[in-house]
Amino acid sequence: MTKADIIESVYEKVGFSKKEAAEIVEMVFDTIKETLERGEKIKISGFGNFIVREKKSRVGRNPQTGEEIEISARRVLTFRPSQVLKNALNLSDMVQPPV
């Protein structure tokens, strides 16, 4: 599913114009992005948590040469699905065979 698909779904289900649906979806994504940029956690009940983690710098190895290199510190985004989402995914697997 793409952002355009999400906009189309909001348009069909809520009844806003396509322009309004696009603006709402953009605002939601912008809010999520800005919150994550500040390093804050996002909890969406029944869906899951988006968490920004700090990774320390560490020594890695070039697999071709064996040379040690430093991997710089960085922030990574992780997603932990809620139990409700996990259950919904597993229930849908039981109802419909995978394609």
UniProtKB/Swiss-Prot annotation:
It holds the Pfam family Bac_DNA_binding. GO terms for cellular component: cytosol. Heterodimer of an alpha and a beta chain. PANTHER family: DNA-BINDING PROTEIN HU, INTEGRATION HOST FACTOR SUBUNIT ALPHA. SUPFAM superfamilies: IHF-like DNA-binding proteins. CDD domains: IHF_A. This is Integration host factor subunit alpha. HAMAP family: IHF_alpha. NCBIfam families: himA (TIGR00987), PRK00285.1 (NF001401). GO terms for biological process: DNA recombination; positive regulation of metabolic process; regulation of DNA-templated transcription; regulation of translation. SMART domains: BHL. Belongs to the bacterial histone-like protein family. Keywords: DNA recombination, DNA-binding, Transcription, Transcription regulation, Translation regulation. This protein is one of the two subunits of integration host factor, a specific DNA-binding protein that functions in genetic recombination as well as in transcriptional and translational control. One of its GO terms (molecular function) is DNA binding.
